[in-house]
From Swiss-Prot:
Protein kinase domain boundaries: 98-377
Organism lineage string: Viruses, Riboviria, Pararnavirae, Artverviricota, Revtraviricetes
A GO molecular-function annotation: ATP binding
Additional free-text comment from the UniProt record: This protein is synthesized as a Gag-Ros polyprotein.
Residue positions where Phosphotyrosine is found in the record: Y268
Family, as annotated: Belongs to the protein kinase superfamily. Tyr protein kinase family. Insulin receptor subfamily.
Name of the protein in question: Tyrosine-protein kinase transforming protein ros
GO biological process, one term: cell surface receptor protein tyrosine kinase signaling pathway
Keywords, ordered alphabetically: ATP-binding, Kinase, Nucleotide-binding, Oncogene, Phosphoprotein, Transferase, Tyrosine-protein kinase
Entries under InterPro entries matching the protein: Kinase-like_dom_sf, Prot_kinase_dom, Protein_kinase_ATP_BS, RTK, Ser-Thr/Tyr_kinase_cat_dom, Tyr_kinase_AS, Tyr_kinase_cat_dom, Tyr_kinase_rcpt_2_CS
Cited PANTHER family: PROTO-ONCOGENE TYROSINE-PROTEIN KINASE ROS (PTHR24416:SF527), TYROSINE-PROTEIN KINASE RECEPTOR (PTHR24416)
Record carries keyword rRNA-binding: no
Record's keyword annotation contains Cytoplasm: no
Amino acid sequence: DTVTSPDITAIVAVIGAVVLGLTSLTIIILFGFVWHQRWKSRKPASTGQIVLVKEDKELAQLRGMAETVGLANACYAVSTLPSQAEIESLPAFPRDKLNLHKLLGSGAFGEVYEGTALDILADGSGESRVAVKTLKRGATDQEKSEFLKEAHLMSKFDHPHILKLLGVCLLNEPQYLILELMEGGDLLSYLRGARKQKFQSPLLTLTDLLDICLDICKGCVYLEKMRFIHRDLAARNCLVSEKQYGSCSRVVKIGDFGLARDIYKNDYYRKRGEGLLPVRWMAPESLIDGVFTNHSDVWAFGVLVWETLTLGQQPYPGLSNIEVLHHVRSGGRLESPNNCPDDIRDLMTRCWAQDPHNRPTFFYIQHKLQEIRHSPLCFSYFLGDKESVAPLRIQTAFFQPL
């Protein structure tokens, strides 16, 4: 049968209508998708989503003043990235209840600001002064991952001598970690600030220095129980609650989780094929084999005690980082500070045993420090007659290696 002209016209009309309909439907679907994406971007992000927005106006203003702030006030680095569920379990805090006031410290990657947070401690608690950590503009994906690791890590800790994470703002960029504010800054700067001229009364007594060591040791006991290896115990990575040296309410906490590595660059050494290493605080097995354990943390704590007694001297004075590496590998050790009590010197020496298993536990160290702290010897150094106190008053004599 032949197809007539009207039949062909009808077929063409049907095909044209189908094509036109499909084209219109495609356009409608594309328009709907674009509209939905734009609408979705305007919505507040749901829990756990990370949405890039324009830079926080408040942060931008403070960053404009960053050049006037030095690095001396640095305060505030787990191997796997936290899961989405772990990120969502972090203590989220509304950005509109957080105000940033001034820059406290800045390194190559991170910044720490002082701010206030409304009702962050509890509903109705009012404004609390806080420290706020954020990444610098242009942070890499790796740095952002480390930032999330830090938040997840800190959220696990709950101890009077571990810096507390109060909340996070992760829904938008820039992301923030909200931490308790430690007004005394980092311990290294605090110790160095206590140095006085000859024949002037010390701002920190031996009892004060032992109390500082005890605070840190208590935090280490907790980390040991949590099976957490710090890897970078040092005075620069601890924080002090009070600026005043005579304050009875002073508390020292383990508080680094990153920025100090930016600030005190000279305390680190970049070994070929590895990241920055705090060689002056590292045990032989860490330097030789890259092994880090609670035993290597004990070694580092011994160095931290030495730092405390010398009011913040750099360990192994006069040696370069590479010289320190060879010195420790070959069995060399720090010399005892002048006039250091025998019990404290012996405890430091035990922390630096060549065999890691011969080093004491943090629980034992805490017990021993408490024993020394309350001993008649320590009391005589603190309150004794002029002859026993005189060496402590001449700090340039007492706080120097032999």
